[in-house]
Every structure is written in C-alpha cells, then in structure tokens.
Amino acid sequence: MVATSEPKIAVKAQYVKDLSFENPDPINSLFKITEKPKIDTKLDINITKLSEDNHFEVELSTNVSATCNDKKIFHIEVVYAGIFQLTNISEEDKKFILSVRCPEIIFPYVRQIISESTQKGGFLPLMIDYIDFAEIISNTQTTNNPQKSIKPEFDVSNKQ
C-alpha cells in the first residue's frame, strides 16, 4: 500500500454537548398567541486543537429565542460538536476548513435538533435558514483583525 499525500478531512465523531429547551409559559404561548413571533438566532463557532495530532473539535453554539410582545415564548440552546482529523492540509487551508467547511458539515444536525425541539415543545418545527459560513467569516475578517480569532459571534436571524 502506497502512502498518499492527498489532503483529507475525516469526521471522527459528532455529538450534542448541551441541549436546552425552555417554554416559560406554555399555556399562553401555545394557545393565546395570535401574532407571528420574532425569532432571534445567534451562532458561535469554537475551534479547539486536541492533543492528538491533526485532530480538532469544531463546536457550533446556537441560541434561538422566540418573543411576542416582549414576552419570551421559547428559548433553545444547542451546542453541537464534531471531531475532525485534517491530514496533509496547509496551516492556511486549515483555518478555512475549520471555520467554514467543518461547520457546514455539522450545521444540518443543529438545524434538525432545533426543528425537532420546537416541534416537541408544542410549536411548529422551526427551520433555520442555510448559513453561508464562508461569507460570514469573510465579513468578520474584513471588519475585525483577521489574526485576532476564528471565534466570531454571528447574528443569523431567521427571516421568516
């Protein structure tokens, strides 16, 4: 077998680190709300180099709040992570892969968890729009010092 030097991304694990669903006033929020609620979504990416060679944990921390007339209807917090092994990838490319490609791989799972959680909470399933991580990182780097961090906080409010 010949050793290859081709770039490779391997997903070693995916998991929920934290999941919380709050429905502070279910009687009123499920039966007495007549207006469409305002949905606010915040997303944070955390990247941690693990002790194993070329292994990284990429974590998406998502908070979704629904309010109507300044009253909280529900709040969801999901922290979902993946362990990725990057092989034969330059340091410059690693930053892009870890802050864009890896979040793109795990985001659909976060979206599904949010949808299922709202539905199990008695609401219609909330489908978060697709997120263009490359555009967000590009915008963050043009407004901030790109050397500072690859851990920006994003406002990706749903436009429903």
From Swiss-Prot:
Task: Provide the Gene Ontology terms for cellular component.
Answer: cytoplasm
Swiss-Prot/TrEMBL keywords: Chaperone, Cytoplasm, Protein transport, Translocation, Transport
UniProt record, GO biological process: protein folding; protein tetramerization; protein transport
List the InterPro entries hit by this protein, alphabetically. Answer: SecB, SecB-like_sf
Where is the protein localized?
A: Cytoplasm
PANTHER family hit by this protein? PROTEIN-EXPORT PROTEIN SECB, PTHR36918
Protein role: One of the proteins required for the normal export of preproteins out of the cell cytoplasm. It is a molecular chaperone that binds to a subset of precursor proteins, maintaining them in a translocation-competent state. It also specifically binds to its receptor SecA.
**Which HAMAP family does the record cross-reference, listed alphabetically?**
SecB
Q: How does this protein assemble?
A: Homotetramer, a dimer of dimers. One homotetramer interacts with 1 SecA dimer.
Q: What is this protein called?
A: Protein-export protein SecB
